[in-house]
């Protein structure tokens, strides 16, 4: 009897392993998967605060770029769409101290356009990328209207 139970447990374990081997994490429709995140590239132009709120309405934040590889991925999608895109970066709370607004963490990685950030006119407190800046970043007034990139972690796995 004990041997039968043990064999049954092995069979169940093997079935579970086979099922979860085909486990796929998916992004919502309209979002793009990369690494451990899903990204949404807007085609609407909004100021930085409204763009951030739009991302939050979808349980996401404006994108935080942490590596050169992630930066290159985001740029590769943006070039197909055209335009400038807001990221989550700001120095609104302390001039010259750039941080990711959603985490309050200082930049560990950055890719500023040569000579940037400049804080031109004393009011450039938000980070954008794309357009003529290519993979580079620039600071801009948060009240300007641009497209934006949202980021969220992959949703729970779907077994299939």
Q: Where do the model's predicted regions map?
A:
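Extracellular, disulfide-bonded carbohydrate-recognition/adhesion ectodomains
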Residues: 1-160
């Amino acid at each position: 009897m004990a041997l039968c139970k043990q064999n049954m447990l092995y069979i169940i374990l093997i079935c579970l392993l086979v099922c979860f081997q085909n486990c796929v994490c998916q992004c919502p429709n309209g979002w793009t998967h990369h690494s451990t995140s899903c990204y949404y590239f807007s085609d609407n132009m909004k100021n930085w605060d409204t763009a951030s709120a739009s991302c939050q309405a979808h349980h996401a934040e404006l994108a935080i770029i942490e590596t050169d590889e992630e930066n290159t991925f985001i740029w590769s999608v943006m070039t197909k769409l055209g335009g400038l895109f807001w990221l989550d970066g700001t120095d609104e709370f302390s001039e010259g101290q750039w941080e990711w607004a959603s985490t309050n963490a200082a930049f560990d990685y950055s890719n500023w356009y040569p000579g940037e950030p400049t804080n031109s006119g004393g009011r450039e407190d938000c980070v954008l990328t794309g357009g003529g800046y290519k993979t580079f970043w620039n600071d801009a007034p948060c009240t300007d209207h641009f497209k934006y990139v949202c980021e969220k972690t992959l949703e729970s796995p779907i077994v299939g």
